[in-house]
Amino acid sequence: MEIVTKIEDLFLPTKHHKFCKDDSFERITWEDVIDNIDRNVCEGAFPPLKLRDNLGIVSHDTRDILKTYPIRQLIMDTRPNIHPTCHLYASLTSISETFGKHDDFMDVIIWQCIGITRWTIYDEKVYQYDLKPGEFLYIPMGMFHDTTPVTPRASISFGLENRPPVAI
């Protein structure tokens, strides 16, 4: 696993996964998570809030979580053609359902906010790592991975879909 010391280096294209710890961003709290869920339910967000088995939650509408904005801005400053998507994943128990082994159609950066999530990454070797609060993990497009909540947890994913500039 490649370890970088500056969070900006996570946003640079690479074919390997990378890891970084950075406590300079204001942490997401359970209050932020509950407020986001409440707003999604009350406003009927689209795409809708997903409640998964065993108290797992996926929120595709995170505009109200202002603590994500400095990271979104850093992504856009570092990769100008990227307008990041942002999703909240919360597991209220350590047995919450996840997506299983899968790959994504875009690069993804995970920000572990609360609790611990075990990541299994299938590269040339299989890596397992327990991501803790304040840590970031970069997963390149097409790299298979799986997650398991070790404790109740909340994390934010930033999808780095490359969108070429549009000519007007």
Model-predicted segments: where are they?
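An N-terminal JmjN-like helical accessory module and its immediate linker preceding a catalytic domain
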Residues: 1-34
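Active-site region of the double-stranded beta-helix
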Residues: 9, 31-135, 143-168
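Conserved beta-strand-loop-short alpha-helix elements that form
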Residues: 138
